[in-house]
């Protein structure tokens, strides 16, 4: 037995060893369980605190099982090592690093949109003096993190935010390894929270059944990344977890600054039933936080596709807002604009044929899903560069008129023209070098 199941079993064995001292082997059971629990922390938790399934649901399951053992151990006068407590505290603090402005962690992989304060009210029982936990649960003034945006170098997520209030903006870039279990085919996907809402969302987590909806949420189709020739990413096909993977850093570059945050990664493991690594997707994400002229922070996403053959590329953006207008180079929603340097685009919502597209799970039980607009941008090419701007808006502020950017991969200039007459022009390398 491995993974979170092993931790559950060792939690149970440890508690039996504590609660039933009349059994001759109780001490041996406790010792065996403690040894395994210590080993699994090193085996399953990345140095940045994320459990190796990379799920915001199962990371919590693992911590819960350690906490249940620790509370019983302390109640019966048993010693819990400082090393175990330190590693668990770091794993707990991951929730704050990932936390959206609504106070919840995002639904990553087979994850859960989970309230951090509710979780930490429980965690406080084993970490009563932890400043981060007290900041969340008691509004403890000195516990506020000394960072806003942060990278998780081993688990491969980049969290970009403007601050810690409910009015702030937040974005998540997924450059993660595939993870040990409960994975979705979603490398290079993005989430974006602004104006009090997760505007750029995804399919989410759904019931563990064999339905079309379950297949959809697992697939690239349900995420904000690129498909090739109507085929999804397929890391699962050739995937095998290795023990040393827990110590390997992810393929993630980043820089964080007062005006721009930047992240970059690649997907090169192939698409379709028999994936061949002939197509490389490089994605750069630029998060503008300046809020000049009253604009809400916005995302600039630069994608470069590279192949020796001509392919049909498809960019997907799942927007949780009411559609207003479809125009050349721009699709407007009530709360956000999606502007792009490609020419061909459509909005798909609640489509079941020829394949499911434009849905979002609203729970993990069967039937708990709804329709959701999905922007589909397409281009035929071998080598191509496409720039997409995702700009939240209130009234005229933030409305994008157009994006001007060359399709040549070697070019790096971007010009964003807004409806209010303002313009932002930059070169990718200038931002990367000066952040």
Positions of PLM-derived features:
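Extended ligand-binding groove/face enriched in aromatic
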Residues: 1-7, 11
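CBM-like, beta-strand-rich accessory domains located in the C-terminal region of large
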Residues: 3, 112, 118-120, 206-435
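Catalytic-loop motifs flanking and including active-site residues across diverse enzymes
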Residues: 9, 62-65, 222
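Tandem amphipathic alpha-helical repeat scaffolds
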Residues: 11-18
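Short, charged, amphipathic alpha-helices and their helix-cap/turn boundaries
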Residues: 31-43, 388
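Carbohydrate-active enzyme catalytic cores, enriched for enzymes
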Residues: 46, 50-200, 379-385, 400-435
């Amino acid at each position: 037995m491995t993974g979170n199941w092993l931790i559950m079993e060792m939690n149970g064995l440890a508690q039996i060893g504590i609660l039933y001292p009349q059994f001759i082997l109780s001490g041996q059971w406790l010792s065996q369980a403690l040894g395994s629990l210590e080993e699994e922390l090193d085996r399953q938790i990345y140095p940045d605190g994320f459990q190796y399934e990379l799920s915001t649901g199962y990371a919590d399951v693992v911590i819960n099982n350690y906490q249940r053992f620790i509370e019983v151990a302390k109640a019966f006068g048993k010693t819990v090592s400082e090393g175990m407590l330190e590693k668990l505290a770091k794993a707990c603090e991951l929730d704050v690093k990932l936390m959206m402005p609504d106070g919840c962690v995002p639904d990553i992989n087979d994850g859960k949109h989970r309230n951090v304060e509710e979780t930490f009210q429980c965690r406080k029982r084993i970490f009563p003096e932890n400043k981060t936990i007290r900041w969340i649960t008691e509004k403890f003034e000195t516990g506020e993190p000394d960072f806003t945006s942060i990278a998780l170098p081993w688990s491969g997520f980049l969290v970009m935010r403007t601050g810690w209030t409910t009015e702030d903006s937040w974005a998540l870039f997924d450059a993660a390894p595939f993870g040990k279990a409960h994975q979705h085919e979603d490398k290079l996907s993005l989430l974006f929270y602004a104006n009090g809402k997760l505007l750029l969302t995804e399919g989410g987590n759904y019931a563990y059944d064999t339905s079309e909806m379950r297949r959809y949420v697992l697939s690239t189709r349900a995420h904000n990344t690129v498909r090739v020739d109507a085929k999804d990413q397929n890391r699962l096909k050739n995937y095998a977890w290795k023990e040393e993977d827990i110590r390997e850093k992810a393929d993630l570059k980043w820089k964080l600054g007062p005006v721009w945050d930047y992240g970059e990664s690649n997907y090169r493991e192939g698409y379709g039933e028999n994936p061949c690594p002939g197509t490389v997707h490089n994605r750069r994400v630029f998060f503008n936080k300046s809020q000049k002229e009253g604009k809400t922070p916005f995302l600039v996403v630069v994608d470069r596709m590279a192949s020796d053959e001509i392919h049909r590329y498809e960019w997907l953006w799942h927007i949780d807002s009411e559609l207003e207008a479809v125009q050349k180079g721009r699709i407007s929603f009530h709360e956000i604009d999606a502007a792009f340097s490609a020419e061909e685009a459509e909005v798909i919502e609640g489509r079941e044929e020829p394949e499911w597209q434009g849905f979002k799970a609203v729970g993990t039980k069967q039937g708990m899903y709804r329709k959701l607009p999905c922007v589909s941008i397409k281009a035929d090419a071998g080598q191509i560069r496409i720039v997409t701007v995702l700009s939240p808006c209130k009234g005229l502020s933030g409305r994008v008129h157009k994006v001007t950017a060359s399709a040549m991969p070697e070019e790096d200039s971007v010009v964003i023209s807004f409806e209010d007459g303002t313009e932002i022009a930059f070169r990718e390398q200038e931002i990367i070098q000066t952040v």
